[in-house]
């Protein structure tokens, strides 16, 4: 009896923490391949070292974004915002088109319910900045405004002067 109670408490804790989340991949190029594959060329692992003095222009920088939401919380709207180091206002603001809420719910309802894994709705997009002007080192941040009221942090890339 006690063990069932503990399992229920743990399950409720896990279920309450399953919320929307996302991530970004920063790279030099994104290529569409045969079979619907994407290739990420020159991926950065949290930092990009710049050998030229600031300000400077990068020929291209790409960001691929994934946003996941529990199936019980379909998206109404998604607005992706990118911020350059030191800026409070986004230099890029891109909406991601989302299907109607009922279409998202119907799609999830048609999935096999016995997978054992939680079901998520996934939104993804690729942003290509060519060229990209950088005034100073610091953090390039990626955020998403979900349903016009929830800001989701999707990652950042530290831009540093190489020594």
Each PLM stretch: what is its role?
Residues 11-137, 141-146, 150-163:
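Contiguous segments within soluble domain cores/interaction surfaces
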């Amino acid at each position: 009896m006690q063990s069932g109670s503990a399992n229920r408490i743990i399950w409720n804790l896990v279920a309450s923490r399953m919320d929307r989340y996302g991530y970004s991949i920063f790279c030099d190029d994104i290529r569409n391949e045969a079979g619907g594959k994407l290739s990420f060329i020159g991926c950065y692992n949290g930092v990009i070292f710049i050998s030229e003095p600031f300000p400077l222009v990068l020929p291209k920088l790409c960001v691929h974004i994934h946003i996941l939401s529990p199936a019980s919380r379909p998206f109404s709207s998604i607005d992706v915002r990118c911020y350059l180091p030191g800026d409070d206002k986004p230099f890029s603001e891109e909406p991601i088109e989302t299907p109607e809420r009922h279409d998202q719910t119907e799609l999830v309802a048609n999935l096999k319910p016995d997978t054992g894994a939680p079901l998520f709705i996934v939104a993804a997009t690729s942003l290509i900045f060519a060229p990209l002007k950088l005034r100073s080192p610091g953090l390039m941040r990626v955020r998403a405004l979900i349903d016009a009221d929830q800001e989701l942090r999707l990652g950042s890339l530290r831009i540093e002067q190489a020594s």
